[in-house]
């Protein structure tokens, strides 16, 4: 299965229009949204940018509702639980806009998750660290897909306040204290950590390149072969890279 992955949007509503053109052109099987639709150090004071972004997200969700998996980023959670979960760039004047937009996404029949797996690939906003290798079930020599089920189910059923930690899939950044979880030789795809170009950290591919100076590349991953293709905003395939 070939999956188009949309990383951090941060009020750049045009990304949904380009993603739509990519889907119309290349007919990929599925779309995964990695979260962080909102907040921006550039556009964050502009409530109209919030409205346009949530409108575009709701439109995209409706069009691809049968072929889409939607994930939360830390910035969405900060609007769902403003009392306990906060992050930089938050605009409290946009709370109603963001929550109404999230409701519209759910109203087309979508569940918004924190983590998911498709084929041999695990998707989350920031990456799943090997902090989660401590789950007792993983010591029972499970089949890879069973282990991925245990991990993603545990994450998706954890309270947001308990995910407000550096090692969680909402906040994780690559480091040598907690390496990326690699149960069953999985590949991980995540955003959150800005980089000019996508890059591998062990088995984790970080694709948050949509910021000034970034390469602005969408990612397409084959969940069976692990082949990765990058597509720019003009719909050109830029280069391919496979996981070792």
What is each of the regions a protein language model found here?
Residues 170-231:
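Conserved beta-sheet core of the metallophosphoesterase superfamily
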Residues 10-17, 39-42, 75-82, 129-131, ...:
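Active-site environment of divalent metal-dependent phosphoester hydrolases
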Residues 1, 26-29, 65-67, 119, ...:
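A general structural motif
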Residues 5-7, 31-36, 69-74, 123-124, ...:
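Active-site neighborhood of phospho(di)ester-bond hydrolases with catalytic His/Asp-centered motifs
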């Amino acid at each position: 299965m070939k999956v188009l992955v949309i990383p951090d949007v941060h009020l750049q509503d045009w990304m949904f229009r380009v993603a739509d053109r990519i889907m119309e052109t290349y007919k990929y099987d599925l779309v995964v949204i990695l979260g962080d639709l909102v907040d921006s150090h550039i556009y964050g004071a502009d409530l109209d940018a919030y409205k346009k972004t949530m409108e575009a997200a709701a439109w995209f969700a409706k069009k691809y509702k049968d072929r889409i998996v939607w994930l939360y980023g830390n910035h969405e959670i900060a609007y769902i639980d403003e009392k306990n979960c906060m992050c930089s760039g938050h605009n409290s004047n946009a709370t109603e806009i963001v929550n109404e937009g999230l409701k519209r996404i759910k109203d087309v029949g979508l569940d918004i998750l924190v983590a998911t797996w498709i084929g041999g690939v695990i998707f989350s906003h920031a990456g799943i660290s090997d902090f989660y290798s401590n789950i007792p079930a993983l010591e029972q020599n499970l089949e890879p897909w069973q282990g991925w089920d245990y991990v993603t189910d545990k994450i998706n059923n954890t309270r947001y306040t308990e995910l407000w930690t550096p090692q969680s899939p909402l906040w994780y950044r690559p480091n040598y204290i907690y390496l990326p979880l690699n149960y069953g030789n999985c590949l991980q795809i995540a955003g959150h950590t800005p980089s000019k170009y996508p890059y591998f950290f062990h088995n984790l591919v970080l694709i948050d390149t949509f910021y000034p100076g970034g390469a602005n590349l969408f990612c397409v991953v084959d969940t069976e072969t692990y082949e990765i293709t990058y597509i720019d905003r003009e719909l050109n395939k830029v280069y391919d890279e496979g996981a070792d």
